[in-house]
């Protein structure tokens, strides 16, 4: 019986599409949870509480063996030698350097705690479709940070892509400004854009550490930092309320943690390994379209010509930007 073997490119395409579509469901599930009256802090704490064991497993897979070697060495080393840092110590072959713990903590705060918190807050005021389109501006924020912070040159094509992307966002924004659709579109948009900016700082600041630690190790440890912050915040704000939520809210939080947080991480990483970062990013362009479709079907969010055209324009702008970055 013949065995069907997928080519690496086809596997990468499948992983990328599935990961993008799962991640695009996040806003839909959060909106469903809000219908049960749960607070932002409580639901975010629940999501990260359920996700923490998976990130801890990845972190242990990455560094568990090295930690065990170091612990055994400390037990067996002569008195007064445990602080010595010559080539005989387990630290000598470690990818971690002095100060990395604080760098990872800062990246976890910016990229996974603050970005998530602002995003969850923003979804109280804007549609899931607008939220996804605004988050899709991430590459343009990274470009602007590279210009004004890192002083890197930008080509005319990149500036064109920037203008096209923001034109599309304006169109989608105008669609959501209909008073019958949302509560406070300007506030919600500002919060989601703040989330996007916070995550862009993470992307710009994580470059050297990603190359040295690897994407999975860095993501796991930074996410664990965010898990601690989110759960602590939920307990400080609501006490034990996060443990007294109805089954529906607990189930939605678990689904958000597994299917919209953990799985997309592994699938996107696998897609990048098979396709490369440029092509994987282009595959991810299905995200905003899928969110708008689910918003209409699951949440009953109205769609319109401005939203559809604006989303297409944003995708075009990001596509131009990603291709320009690939050629650079």
Question: PLM features: what roles do these ranges have?
Answer:
Residues 7-13, 37-41, 45, 96-100, ...:
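Juxtamembrane helix-entry segments on the extracytoplasmic side of multipass membrane proteins
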Residues 16, 100-104, 154-166, 213-222, ...:
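Cytoplasmic-side transmembrane-helix entry/capping segments in multi-pass membrane proteins
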Residues 55, 145, 154-176, 230, ...:
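Hydrophobic transmembrane alpha-helices of multi-pass small-molecule transport proteins
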Residues 20, 45-46, 130-137, 203-228, ...:
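Helix-helix packing/entry segments at the starts of transmembrane helices
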Residues 42-53, 111, 116-153, 158, ...:
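Specific alpha-helical transmembrane segments that line the substrate/conduction pathway
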């Amino acid at each position: 019986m013949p065995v069907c073997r997928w080519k690496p490119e086809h596997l990468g395409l499948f992983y990328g599409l599935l990961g993008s579509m799962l991640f695009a469901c996040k806003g839909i599930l959060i909106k469903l949870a809000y219908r049960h009256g749960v607070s932002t802090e409580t639901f975010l704490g629940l999501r990260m509480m359920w996700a923490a064991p998976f990130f801890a497993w990845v972190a242990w897979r990455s560094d568990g063996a090295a930690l065990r070697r170091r612990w055994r060495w400390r037990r067996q080393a002569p008195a007064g030698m445990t602080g010595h840092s010559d080539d005989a110590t387990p630290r000598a072959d470690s990818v971690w350097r002095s100060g990395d713990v604080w760098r990872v903590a800062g990246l976890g705060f910016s990229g996974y705690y603050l970005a998530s918190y602002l995003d969850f807050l923003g979804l109280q005021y804007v549609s899931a479709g607008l939220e996804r389109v605004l988050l899709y501006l991430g590459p343009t924020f990274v470009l602007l940070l590279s210009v004004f912070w890192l002083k890197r040159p930008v080509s005319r094509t990149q500036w064109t892509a920037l203008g096209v992307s923001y034109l599309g966002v304006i169109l989608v924004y105008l669609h959501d400004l209909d008073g019958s659709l949302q509560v406070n579109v300007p506030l919600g948009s500002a919060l989601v854009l703040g989330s996007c900016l916070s995550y862009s700082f993470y992307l710009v600041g994580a470059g050297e550490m990603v190359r040295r630690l690897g994407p999975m190790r860095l993501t796991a440890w930074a996410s664990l930092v965010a898990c601690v912050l989110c759960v602590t915040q939920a307990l400080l704000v609501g006490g034990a309320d996060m443990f007294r939520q109805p089954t529906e809210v607990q189930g939605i939080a678990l689904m958000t943690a597994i299917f919209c947080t953990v799985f997309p991480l592994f699938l996107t990483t696998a897609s990048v390994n098979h396709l490369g970062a440029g092509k994987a990013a282009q595959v991810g362009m299905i995200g905003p379209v899928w969110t708008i479709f689910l918003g209409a079907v699951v949440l009953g969010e109205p769609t319109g010509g401005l939203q559809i055209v604006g989303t297409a324009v944003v995708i075009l702008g990001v596509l131009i930007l990603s291709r320009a970055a690939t050629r650079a």
